[in-house]
Curated annotation (Swiss-Prot):
The keyword Oxidoreductase applies. It comes from Vaccinia virus (strain Copenhagen) (VACV). Induction: Expressed early in the viral replicative cycle. It catalyses: a 2'-deoxyribonucleoside 5'-diphosphate + [thioredoxin]-disulfide + H2O = a ribonucleoside 5'-diphosphate + [thioredoxin]-dithiol. GO terms for biological process: deoxyribonucleotide biosynthetic process. GO terms for molecular function: ATP binding; ribonucleoside-diphosphate reductase activity, thioredoxin disulfide as acceptor. Keywords: Allosteric enzyme, ATP-binding, Deoxyribonucleotide synthesis, Early protein, Magnesium, Nucleotide-binding, Oxidoreductase. This is Ribonucleoside-diphosphate reductase large subunit. DTTP binds at residues 226-228, 243, 256. The keyword rRNA-binding does not apply.
Amino acid sequence: MFVIKRNGYKENVMFDKITSRIRKLCYGLNTDHIDPIKIAMKVIQGIYNGVTTVELDTLAAEIAATCTTQHPDYAILAARIAVSNLHKETKKLFSEVMEDLFNYVNPKNGKHSPIISSITMDIVNKYKDKLNSVIIYERDFSYNYFGFKTLEKSYLLKINNKIVERPQHMLMRVAVGIHQWDIDSAIETYNLLSEKWFTHASPTLFNAGTSRHQMSSCFLLNMIDDSIEGIYDTLKRCALISKMAGGIGLSISNIRASGSYISGTNGISNGIIPMLRVYNNTARYIDQGGNKRPGVMAIYLEPWHSDIMAFLDLKKNTGNEEHRTRDLFIALWIPDLFMKRVKDDGEWSLMCPDECPGLDNVWGDEFERLYTLYERERRYKSIIKARVVWKAIIESQIETGTPFILYKDACNKKSNQQNLGTIKCSNLCTEIIQYADANEVAVCNLASVALNMFVIDGRFDFLKLKDVVKVIVRNLNKIIDINYYPIPEAEISNKRHRPIGIGVQGLADAFILLNYPFDSLEAQDLNKKIFETIYYGALEASCELAEKEGPYDTYVGSYASNGILQYDLWNVVPSDLWNWEPLKDKIRTYGLRNSLLVAPMPTASTAQILGNNESVEPYTSNIYTRRVLSGEFQVVNPHLLRVLTERKLWNDEIKNRIMADGGSIQNTNLPEDIKRVYKTIWEIPQKTIIKMAADRGAFIDQSQSMNIHIADPSYSKLTSMHFYGWSLGLKTGMYYLRTKPASAPIQFTLDKDKIKPLVVCDSEICTSCSG
């Protein structure tokens, strides 16, 4: 039996050669648990005559990946095999790869179709010796298999459907794409990215340095006008943004309700639902960058709109398909008055924005005055109990996980953009709170800090965190200036207000590395100090940029220009970790370069790449299946697996017990100290999660994507959670509602014979959303 080598030659299959290749990649791994011979034997079983060495490597990597539940080092081995395979298939020198990407010719029409921009190519040509010399390819081998496969599927650039970039090439392309001729800053960014201190957002990783360098993640739009022209002009904006991989949040509260008179045609409006069907079909039609990200929009509506009940049914599984928009996400922009009416079991008036104009343009006391004026004037379409609407909201959330909940008054009251006008919606993932109007489309560029990296020698390094955050601020400011904007209204907005969004990933990993239970007082204190540090570092860097380049255009009149920072708006006194008064004085003198700075986002894909838990979330499970575009992988909490193997507690019985319990270790006989640290989200009181969100909220000047997890949700449980979050002053009350099914699915690779029959399993292996 023979294999076909990369050079096309045939060679007889040799078991020892396969074993030797795998063994070479086992350096630094736990040899007590990693068995190259076992992997090689399974590879041999999959061989056929004429198999290629590329296929052999792919098979070996997949086999190693399936052994991850035995030891986390198998995930590293799997990645090393896959990375080594890629290295053998790609050129080494960064400059040569960039040259190939620039010189690409479309084989179908013979036209020169450069994948990277001419300026990127010019920079690389000028500094190629320096750039080539600083790249450290060994860092490619630090990715786990799951992270590498995510990169391979969607992030590494291809020519004729063949990957030509290595991960280090991608990171250097991103660094050069951001900093351009500032090579020293590009190298600094490259090193921080490749050492995994932080990551830029997916659109930046996709597009930096390319011919279409659209690096922004989030776009927020208001409906231009309640007219055919306004509706379709807005739709065109959405299409152009979605085409370039932007996620969209759209406010439609100014669109007239069904049954309303249309003076221009002497007709009657069909309301928002038929319009949203058109938007839904646009989202389905547009494919972002070759299946990298599907076209996605979140639609925001205020609950006084008289189409609210039909809106809440849009994503339900049953009912008339003509009244469903399954490809849109729905979100509510809730004024405090509605929450008060629900709390008091009061009545709620449903109105049409054409007959009751201006409600979407005001908030707080001004909204309450206008709304109650329209009530007194009987301009409403109908009156129902506020709790009838509330019940419909809860029922929709239990069935579909949506609508998202954001509190209009908190979002406006605590925004440093309050001086611009009323903010009418958030974005697709509920963490961006920015002003938009008919002439401006709000934009945000994102990056996230890998918090696990800052746990050094058993302590959290706040100074290093501040330094990395300052680099991120400088990077995101450069992106604002050089970005390719899909529509001019986005460029106008972004360059006037210069908002950025710094988030985090690996908060749960940092707690675990410090041996803090997620709901412990130590974790709650660290949670506050981390975000205090991020906010402080971001403000300091933004002020330093303002000293050099001037404040952003609309700085005057903002809270910050009057010496008021985010924590002041929450009536919170910061800790003594940082010296805030001198920073406030400096801001008064020089201003800020950015209107907004901090916005913890979901980080779904980038956390997968870096091997961290998502955003600020606890682990949803200790063993589960991950599903992404590249396939399905079984993942074990590597921290738990490492501690159990070190303490000689890991065995098949424990593995199967945990899998039978849906990833929980609470029903095992493991030591209590381990059980406390490795609680899943389902075992942590949701009020603790909400309280921690409010604690860090004082240092988050945008908002945060916060999911609510309730295994068995009910009207009373959800109502309690929502009102608790509202009472604490949260801006985002809920991103998704995550629940568990009534009965468990068949467990993945479960050996039932090795489970003691004392517990009946009724849990699922939970997967987090890819927001």
